[in-house]
Amino acid sequence: MLASIFNFTGQGFKPMEKVYTQVSHKIAVKNIKAMFKASSQTQINAGMAWYQNAQDQAQAIAIKHDMPVYIVVAVIAALSPNNKWARNLQNADDLIAGFIAGDAMETIKVSTYHKMKAKAWSILQDIPDYDTAKTMLNGQKITSFFMDIMGEFNVTIDGHARNIAYNERVGLTDDRTNIGVREYRALQEAYYDAARDLDLMPYQLQAITWTAWRELHGIV
């Protein structure tokens, strides 16, 4: 009975480490680093540039509308679920323009859920400070996406990032890609450690491996 609860060491018993992922932390780190090492220089360059380009695009919208860049990034993040990147940017631009013009929220079309549009609208109404903007996003993936674009030491875990860590191709409609809070945090830690080993920011490593994984498997 105790063997299932404790690990025995030469110095006594200690509680077993709880595992919230389907592979160990060590294997997840190894899988992530292996995908990075299999990436071409073109894929590495594209991944390294992705989030900086995203911040530059957000900065352009911020300048256009005289809006703090972190507010624009928060709006982009709020509108990101199930949204293509180019359309995500256009939706953010349109929503901000409509808000400034005094249009009703309902008249502005976006390509995501209504509740996400309402969340973005609330951020525009309140113009909160940086930390409050993150709190208002209130969703692990969209908050994480905000942090990545803003350049924090962070990584967003989507279905592809999960598959890379497990070295397993699972479709994004599979229930296994619905990642709970504990699994999400554990996968983030795997990317953090792999990124430290490779002298990268975690979001850079994710973008590189995401690009390489999708190209490897022909994912559009």
Show where each model-derived region lies.
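HhH-family (HhH-GPD) DNA N-glycosylase catalytic core used in base-excision repair
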Residues: L2-V220
